[in-house]
């Protein structure tokens, strides 16, 4: 297991030890006239710095101090010395965080200070990120991972594996875009991204892997891949096209509708919210109110209007972008309704990169012809257990 892949798990375990031992967050020595420092920890990234500077320029009572970690060893040393930050902007496993008590539940503050205000977060995103009634982190921006399906076979968002299998068997269509035909790893990465979401539950202390359901799911993709590789199909229109939606002006390709990835019976539609880093507040912090004030600032319309490389999490700013594109005739009313439907019916949240990497390596071996589906499932189950055991040592 690569050390970088253990970052999320390491932070969770190290903070758990620190909070249990009664350590408090670290602040530098402050003079009587100096404003209090509230520390924000980030990993190898200072893109939040302009926002920090803008906040500090209007704040006299306290200042946000950015702590940039560029090595795992440094973070380990700081944490073991009891110098954890008040809040973090990191990429951590949302469901695993919910299983622990290391972070402040942000939902009461969201309900009290954000709901029905200009800083309100996209409700569908909050609902998806709420696990066991708790909200442990809020992203700065987001995108949606989904699939487009041929409209002549699918009528809208949410398709079952049975429906997709029926369409694949009844019609001579390639399952993937033709240009992907020789790109096994490309295919494997898409299947891996949703497999880690659909079949792994880390919201409890013990991971739950739905092994038999995963085997059925992987077999569907493998069967379609084998047929596409071995036959000359007289069509260049793929049955399904995996895609990411990073702006509300991205309607489906002509002849397609947003369907999400196929899912098994009783599962929600197969689209998911994706984001990189997200804000979280350490439960042992003495500056929870101040940390939340900074998060609120980051969610304000003024800050969210500058979001690029994804969609703003501020619901009013997101609606502004939709209205602007409608006014400029960049999208139609039907396109806007299609996006609203996709947003409204997205319930999953992207899996931890640690989990996705495990699936990707084993699934890639299947698509390359080096492993059978049942063998890949066993390997994934073993590696998931090993990953959790290794994580527990930190």
Name each model-derived stretch:
Residues 91-146, 257-266:
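Hinge/lid segment of periplasmic solute-binding proteins
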